[in-house]
Amino acid sequence: MRKRFEQQLSLGVLPISEVKINTNSRHQLPPLLKALQHIFTTPDLNKAVFDLLEKELMSGKQKTGRFGMNLWEILVLGSVRLNLDADYDHLLDMANEHMALRGILGVGQSDFTRGHEYKYQTLVDNVCLLDEELLRKINTLIVEFTHGLIKKKEGVADLDLRMKVDSYVVEGNIHFPTDLNLLWDSLRKCLDMVGHLSNRGVVLSGLGKHAYWRKQMKSLYRNAAEIHRKKGGNYKERLKVSTKQYTKKSDELRDKFRSAVLVLQQMLEKGMLDLRKALFFKSLIYYLGKLEKHLDLVKRRILNGETIPHSDKEFSIFEDHFQWCSKGKMHKKVELGHPLSIATDQYHLIVDFELMIGIGDAQAGRVIGGRIIENYTSGYNLESISFDRGYYSKLLKKYLEGHFEKVIMPKRGKKTLAQQAEESEEGYKQLRRRHSAVESNINQLEHHGVNRCPDRGIKNFRRYVALGVLSYNLQRMGNLLIAEERAAEKAERIVRRAA
């Protein structure tokens, strides 16, 4: 059971609306806290955000039982984690020790009590409840509200939007893959599962000395890997000899694991494995599959001299969804993760984003363009949208030209006379030059943690990216609110001096 938020005020504890935030600091946290405070104290926005949180996190749940972390705390802590690019230990320390953050959370301490203290596992279990679709909806609300502030400031009814779309790679938290080290990863994880089962009283024939097997296999892996790394005289012959020894022992171990799986399957059918043992057995089957795959790849590439097709390769046994991304950049020839396309406006807000998993640039442009047209029609003029050459698609450009006044999408390769004339227009060239501003937005987004994702699994990867985008936009909203406050204070000082 969860509640939206109920601040139990005690003596000396300030309401969230009265929490003082140091807006003179240039640190990234105060603007975020300012934006969160504004969400909480603005009735319409507060209701819209909490309605979304309540619908996604509490639908189908009973209204009885123990209270969990409330919805407001989940949103605040998730945003702060990405704003600071923090791990959960850092977040725990901030949640328990940072006075302004605790004030926004509604658990501020007083002279008489320290107040509520969070636990590590509580943060881990609750922040991960937010999913990509929920965060995407909240992000749209925040962008629309911030645009409303800009409309009020500029005194316009409809806002002209000039969009810029670009992509970069969000990396995963994995080591650089080779077929040799992926085979070793598979071997050691199989041995780990056997070790866990052995420690719980499951005796498997031929695998009693799993620690010895681990030491022996690591030695064989290191010998082959060092020859591969250092090269030297007769490199290919020496590598083949070393790899033969490595794969021979791997074959022997694989056969033992196969026999162990058959024994464990019989034990499972007879009800001899408890839940913990059954989970280790399931993991053993998974890692055995990876072992067989990478053992085959090592034999094909090194011993048989085959060129392995890209479709047959995997880049991690733990995160097999990651892509090998090579964008031709000087200092990052290869990145392992997923490309992310973002669309920003002239106010540097990220109005939409799309993780490019199994799709190319042009397809991502179609998805982003479609959502922008759907979400930002009423109260907006879609003035322009710009891309780089990688997004070029004749069909995409034609589709967008039906909704945007100007579409900047340079064509790769040879151009027709009409295309040359279009790209030579002064307005076209001006918007194309302004497109590079999206790079600074990407850089700031990377500083919000969306450069390398530490969370495991594709679902958590998507959530992490969406939370980073939301945190980025909240900081932009906070900066705008702080600027308005300063302008109002300056105007007030001028009036007082004139009086």
Where are these regions (language model features)?
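Acidic, metal-coordinating catalytic cores used for nucleic-acid/nucleotide bond scission
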Residues: G65-M69, M99, I385-L395, K414
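Electropositive, glycine- and tryptophan-enriched low-complexity nucleic-acid-binding patches
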Residues: K329-Y376
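Basic, amphipathic alpha-helical segments enriched in Lys/Arg and hydrophobic/aromatic residues
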Residues: I285-G289, E426-A499
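Short, conserved catalytic/metal-binding motifs centered on acidic residues
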Residues: L77, L91, K119-V127, L159-E171, ...
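Charged, often Cys/His-bearing segments associated with DNA-binding zinc-finger transcription factors
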Residues: M1-A48, A483-A499
